[in-house]
């Protein structure tokens, strides 16, 4: 999508503080964190929201969830973390590119 801010981050047109990147997904720090540690994981291929996920997205979503735990542990989440996916306007989804928020009240190591 040409006007999607997350697609522009994937394309390198907008800078981000990256935590992880591979061929399918990107993880980066939230620019307006709601906790001392707050980052997001997005699929590189545009999907509007969790409501638009189909069978073709199962593999990347599984990888994203597995990476969420690994990145949270690397950032110091020994006690646990929150995983949030806002879906649609009523749920306060602000950017219509599927993203998983990972946050916890710890000290950021990145």
Identify what each model region corresponds to.
Residues 1-110:
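HIT superfamily nucleotide-processing domains
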């Amino acid at each position: 999508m040409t006007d999607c801010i997350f697609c522009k981050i994937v394309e390198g047109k907008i800078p981000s503080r990256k935590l992880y990147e591979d061929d399918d997904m990107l993880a980066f720090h939230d620019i307006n964190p709601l906790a001392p540690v707050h980052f997001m994981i997005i699929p590189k291929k545009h999907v509007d929201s969790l409501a638009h996920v189909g069978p073709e997205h199962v593999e990347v979503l599984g990888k994203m969830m597995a990476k969420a735990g690994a990145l949270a542990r690397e950032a110091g989440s020994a006690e646990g973390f929150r995983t949030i996916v806002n879906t649609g306007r009523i749920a306060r989804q602000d950017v219509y590119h599927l993203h998983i928020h990972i946050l916890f009240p710890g000290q950021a190591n990145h």
